[in-house]
From Swiss-Prot:
GO biological process: negative regulation of synaptic assembly at neuromuscular junction; proteasome-mediated ubiquitin-dependent protein catabolic process; protein ubiquitination
Protein name: Kelch-like protein diablo
Keywords per UniProt: Actin-binding, Kelch repeat, Phosphoprotein, Repeat, Ubl conjugation pathway
InterPro entries the UniProt entry points to: BACK (IPR011705), BTB-kelch_protein (IPR017096), BTB/POZ_dom (IPR000210), Gal_Oxase/kelch_b-propeller (IPR011043), Kelch-typ_b-propeller (IPR015915), Kelch_1 (IPR006652), SKP1/BTB/POZ_sf (IPR011333)
Length: 623
């Protein structure tokens, strides 16, 4: 509105109307007399307004009319239940009803319409949604809601049902969900169920659902190149388990199914001793031909280029080839030297050779197929020593040059063939020092320091940059992030995280940087977020199942694993894996040791079994 008067004087608005003659009117003793109109802003030419309450209020009132059966112009007869409604509302929400009521169908002229092949409870929930925009999808109703939503062409409800089923996937039900998705043409759900089935085939093949599969669906599954198996023996064993579940009806399909088992990829011993000697296989001529084909492939290596086909093509399981190492950490009141290896293919943790020193707060990275353990704290002293592990020999060597500073709670990563050590603390102060190791020269050299001192910092490499994420400046946890450009030897700040985090886990996954867990000013965290370098923004993802400070984070064969940590009351040995398709974490086993502040590294699986460590060859603390 108008300006407020100031300093006790009275200001006359410029638009005030003044009465009198000539603009100055004098009366009586020469006093000035005037009349001032009320001050108003100029009238706008138009005033636009959109009510945020109107849609909700209108729907609420329409729903009240429906419930009181007022102004309803159609009754839906579903399974003997009568549902009163308004044609215009149903037509606006559903293409099915729009076609029914606006076309030339007989129903367009009827006041009572019978709807067949739909569950009455599902119909009532969907009509409620049309009037309220609210629905609850749960295990007890999703199998009737989804078909009903498909029939009524309520795409939003279809998507919600599919999202719910995606979150329910596990090895015991994924085949049923896959079939359900296929029946109702839910392509995205079918794709994800297929992917889940392929990825978890070793567990799926043990389920009752697998034994009940129709032959066509079995073939669809086992013919996939993406089937995740340790060897083709597992596929053959799965097929024979399925066959023997109902031999009388299924033996006629054996050759049809066996042609999708890649027999030429079996070991000669298994092919001859197990497949070739099986009575069901031997009794079928087409099956015998498949076995002979595989024998020829194995016996005539010089002819193999001429024998290539679908059965000679190795499968490409997403998990094959990489293993995760958990290194050092804090357990049972002391730093530990133990190291263990996780194989996602078998879901097993195995002990390997321990380091020569106990190390908590150790930085771990893989360079040239060798695992480096940098610095840390041995329970008494801060360390600058380095150890290097060779998985082929299962041995640690200590001939790596030490860092120029002692460092624990240090971030370590590999960029352009150099090993970088970032931040940490040396027992006196929190560090912003950064140095890098040249394996050809066996030498460390300093590069530009960070702009902020950081201990408990997480580091990641993406797009040719080295990122330093969170940590603590020695006083409080940080949410700031900076990145190093090796071309200009310079650190630059980027967008901060939404949460302050020290001792967090960090990894690059699908071109995002994921930051999980850690500790803020008050407590250990389960929350997680990810950074998009293209938009320079952080966005939240679903929280982990446990709070985890001092957690390790790594990508193994295309899956993101969170390893160990501290939940505020106990050291953890559990691990969990993140599925970006469903935005869910799930627990997937335990390490042999509880580990806080251990390092993690990912390597190609060794070619031999010489890396296995005898678990009783050294004393283990309580795990």
């Amino acid at each position: 509105m108008g300006d407020l008067p100031g300093s006790g004087s009275t200001a006359q608005p410029r638009d005030a109307a003044v009465t009198g003659t000539g603009g100055n009117s004098t009366a009586g003793g020469g006093s000035s007399v005037g009349s001032t109109a009320v001050d108003r802003p100029p009238s706008p030419a138009r005033l636009s307004h959109t009510s945020e309450k109107h849609p909700k209020v209108t729907l609420t009132e329409l729903n009240m009319l429906r419930r009181h059966r007022e102004l309803c112009d159609v009754v839906l007869n579903v399974g003997g239940r009568k549902i009163f409604a308004h044609r215009v509302i149903l037509s606006a929400c559903s293409s099915y009803f729009c076609a029914m009521f606006t076309g030339e169908l007989e129903e367009s002229r009827q006041t009572e319409v019978t709807i067949r092949d739909i569950d009455e409870n599902a119909m009532e929930l969907l009509i409620d949604f049309c009037y309220t925009a609210h629905i609850i999808v749960e295990e007890s109703n999703v199998q009737t809601l989804l078909p009903a939503a498909c029939l009524l062409q309520l795409v939003e409800i279809q998507d919600i049902c599919c999202e719910f089923l995606k979150r329910q996937l596990d090895p015991t039900n994924c085949l049923g969900i896959r079939a359900f998705a296929d029946t109702h043409s839910c392509r995205e759900l079918l794709r994800i169920a297929d992917k889940f089935t392929q990825h978890n085939f070793q567990e799926v093949m043990e389920s009752e659902e697998f034994l009940l599969l129709p032959v066509g669906q079995l073939v669809d599954i086992i013919c996939s190149d993406e089937l995740n198996v340790r060897s083709e023996e597992q596929v053959f064993n799965a097929v024979m388990s399925w066959l023997k579940y109902n031999v009388a009806e299924r033996r006629q399909h054996l050759a049809q199914v066996l042609q999708h088992v890649r027999l030429p990829l079996l070991s000669p011993k298994f092919l001859v001793g197990t497949v070739g000697s099986d009575l069901l296989v031997r009794s079928d001529e087409a099956c015998r031909d498949l076995v002979d084909e595989a024998k020829n492939y194995l016996l005539l290596p010089q002819e193999r280029p001429l024998m290539q086909g679908p059965r000679t093509r190795p499968r490409k399981p997403t998990r094959r080839g990489e293993v995760l190492f958990a290194v050092g950490g804090w357990c049972s009141g002391d730093a530990i030297a133990s190291v263990e290896r996780f194989d996602p293919q078998t879901n097993d943790w195995k002990m390997v050779a321990p380091m020569s020193k106990r190390r908590c707060g150790v930085g771990v990275a893989v360079l040239n197929d060798l695992l480096y353990a940098v610095g840390g704290h041995d329970g008494q002293s801060y360390l600058n020593s380095i150890e290097r592990y060779d998985p082929q020999t299962n041995q640690w060597s200590c001939d790596v040059a030490p860092t120029t500073s002692c460092r624990t709670s240090v971030g370590v990563a590999v960029l352009d063939g150099f090993l970088y050590a970032v931040g940490g603390q040396d027992g006196v102060q929190c560090l912003n020092h950064v140095e890098r190791y040249d394996p050809k020269e066996n030498k460390w050299s300093k590069v530009a320091p960070m702009t902020t001192r950081r201990l408990g910092v997480a580091v990641a490499v993406l797009g040719g940059f080295l990122y330093a994420i969170g940590g603590s400046d020695g006083q409080c946890p940080l949410n700031t992030v900076e990145r190093y450009d090796p071309r200009h030897n310079k650190w630059v700040a980027v967008s901060p995280m939404s949460t302050r985090r020290k001792h967090l886990g960090c990894a690059v996954f699908n071109n995002y940087i994921y930051a999980v867990g850690g500790r803020d000013d008050c407590m250990e965290l389960s929350s997680a977020e990810r950074y998009n370098p293209l938009t320079n923004t952080w966005s939240p993802i679903v929280a982990m199942t446990s709070r985890r400070s001092g957690v390790g984070l790594a990508v193994v064969n295309g899956q993101l694993y969170a390893v160990g940590g501290f939940d505020g009351s106990a050291y953890l040995k559990t691990i969990e894996v993140y599925d970006p398709e469903t935005n869910q974490w799930r627990l997937c086993g335990c390490m042999n040791y509880r580990r806080l502040g251990g390092g993690v590294g990912v390597m190609r699986a060794p070619q031999t079994e010489n890396y296995m460590w005898c678990e009783n060859s050294f004393k283990q603390p309580n795990s």
